[in-house]
């Protein structure tokens, strides 16, 4: 069975469109400043699955793949480099920070806007100490042709959100330095 030239071209184009257009995001946010205060405790970091919202306010963003593992590694790397806590890992620590992240893509004035929302709960054992919410936006290009057109603003918005979150946590340092697990009476 021999395929016509038109069919071959169509199948090739279909393969390229279905595989070549997905922007696989890799981020490595870096702290822009040293911590305002340090907390001499170990920190366990856990993340919920990433939520994505596209320009049409529906779940998911067309042609964008941001693996949970990459987001986790990006946040862990940022927290380790910042140096607020004595150690940061996914293993049990003195404190536990659970983060839920959401990326919202919108289009305004012919430019894409990338908003990262972080909801974080700080715990000591199973007891909630404090919750945090931060939202930061970075402006991208007018078109999403290449992966970098998504990656750069996503990384910038994530970095700003992490800076804001850590600033709030560092401001509350006395909560975490003085907090001890209370035994049930």
Where are these regions (language model features)?
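Short secondary-structure boundary motifs at beta->alpha junctions and helix caps
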Residues: 57-64, 125-179
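Surface-exposed short loop/turn segments
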Residues: 22-30, 82, 86-152
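Extracytoplasmic/secreted envelope proteins and their assembly/folding machinery
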Residues: 68, 72-79, 159-162, 166
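Sec-dependent bacterial lipoprotein signal peptides
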Residues: 1-19
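A structural "domain/chain start" motif
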Residues: 2, 20-73, 174-185
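Generic marker of residues within folded, mature protein domains
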Residues: 11, 17, 35, 89, ...
């Amino acid at each position: 069975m021999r395929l016509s030239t038109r069919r071959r071209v169509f199948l090739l184009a279909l393969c390229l469109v279905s595989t070549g257009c997905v922007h696989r995001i890799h981020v490595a946010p870096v702290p822009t400043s040293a911590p305002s205060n340090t907390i001499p405790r170990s920190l366990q970091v856990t993340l919920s699955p990433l939520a994505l919202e596209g320009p049409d306010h529906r779940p998911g963003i067309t042609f964008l793949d941001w693996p949970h593992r990459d987001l986790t590694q990006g946040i862990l790397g940022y927290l380790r480099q910042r140096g607020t806590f004595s150690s940061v890992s996914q293993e049990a620590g003195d404190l536990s920070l659970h983060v839920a992240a959401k990326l919202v893509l919108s289009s305004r004035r012919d430019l894409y806007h990338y908003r990262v929302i972080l909801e974080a709960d700080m715990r000591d054992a199973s007891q909630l100490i404090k919750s945090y919410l931060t939202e930061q936006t970075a402006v991208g290009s007018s078109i999403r042709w290449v992966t970098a057109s998504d990656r750069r603003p996503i990384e910038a918005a994530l970095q700003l959100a992490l800076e804001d979150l850590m600033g709030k946590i560092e401001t509350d340092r006395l909560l975490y330095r003085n907090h001890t697990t209370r035994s049930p009476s």
